[in-house]
Amino acid sequence: MMAYLVFLGPPGAGKGTYAKRLQEITGIPHISTGDIFRDIVKKENDELGKKIKEIMERGELVPDELVNEVVKRRLSEKDCERGFILDGYPRTVAQAEFLDGFLKTQNKELTAAVLFEVPEEVVVQRLTARRICPKCGRIYNLISLPPKEDELCDDCKVKLVQREDDKEETVRHRYKVYLEKTQPVIDYYDKKGILKRVDGTIGIDNVIAEVLKIIGWSDK
């Protein structure tokens, strides 16, 4: 079973959660560009990592060519030979074109770009309820994944905090930016005939079932 997937959707759509669950079921690796960047900037003798760290520390956006290089390097690893689930990339049409070109050199092509559709109000409700333990980093959701004790981490018994990113005004702004920035990428995959839309409000098990149907997965 081979599947090369791109996951698209607003912040709070659950892309990372779905990708992790699908990795458990199918063995297809979940490639989160956020995780790759966090890892690469920690490596002291990685020249590419050093460049990216300097740019991020200046508060600037990492240019496409560096992002592309990082993704290409990760997708060239052995575990991606039979598939991947890309989460957080591509964010621009230029990145989408680069990905297509790279896959072509490997005699591969994307199976599908899966768009998880979640209305703004649902995103706001999900993200503003998110809390994090400042000590261990464990993530909770006051609605869907609450701690056992009121606003205290189950493990550390430390009071949970809300990230600035998860405050309502910021969430609404992030949703607006997502719509503006991602629409061209959605249109790009739609024109190619590989865009698959999934209702991101139907619950995790139903969402997973939809994606498995898209890739023709059978565990028989």
Curated annotation (Swiss-Prot):
The record's subcellular locations are: Cytoplasm
Chain spans, region LID? 129-166
Q: Name one GO cellular component term.
A: cytosol
Q: Which GO terms describe its biological process?
A: AMP salvage; nucleoside diphosphate metabolic process; nucleoside monophosphate metabolic process
Q: What is its EC number?
A: 2.7.4.3
What the entry lists under InterPro entries is as follows: Adenyl_kin_sub, Adenylat/UMP-CMP_kin, Adenylat_kinase_CS, Adenylate_kinase_lid-dom, P-loop_NTPase
Subunit-level organization: Monomer.
PANTHER family tied to this protein: NUCLEOTIDE KINASE
Binding residues for ATP, per the UniProt record? G12, A13, G14, K15, G16, T17, R130, I139, Y140, I202
Q: What does this protein do?
A: Catalyzes the reversible transfer of the terminal phosphate group between ATP and AMP. Plays an important role in cellular energy homeostasis and in adenine nucleotide metabolism.
Record key words, sorted = ATP-binding, Cytoplasm, Kinase, Metal-binding, Nucleotide biosynthesis, Nucleotide-binding, Transferase, Zinc
Native organism is Thermotoga maritima (strain ATCC 43589 / DSM 3109 / JCM 10099 / NBRC 100826 / MSB8)
Give the family per the record: Belongs to the adenylate kinase family.
Q: Where is the signal peptide?
A: none
Q: Where does Zn(2+) bind?
A: C133, C136, C153, C156
Recorded domain comment: Consists of three domains, a large central CORE domain and two small peripheral domains, NMPbind and LID, which undergo movements during catalysis. The LID domain closes over the site of phosphoryl transfer upon ATP binding. Assembling and dissambling the active center during each catalytic cycle provides an effective means to prevent ATP hydrolysis. Some bacteria have evolved a zinc-coordinating structure that stabilizes the LID domain.
Q: Which reaction does it catalyse?
A: AMP + ATP = 2 ADP
Which positions are annotated as binding AMP?
Answer: T33, R38, E60, L61, V62, G88, Y89, P90, R91, Q95, R163, R174
Task: List the CDD domains.
Answer: ADK
Instruction: Give the metabolic or biological pathway.
Output: Purine metabolism; AMP biosynthesis via salvage pathway; AMP from ADP: step 1/1
Name of the protein in question = Adenylate kinase
Tell me one GO molecular function of this protein. Answer: adenylate kinase activity
Q: State whether keyword rRNA-binding applies.
A: no
Name the domain of life this protein comes from: Bacteria
Q: Is Cytoplasm among the key words of this record? A: yes
Residue ranges of region NMP? Answer: 32-62
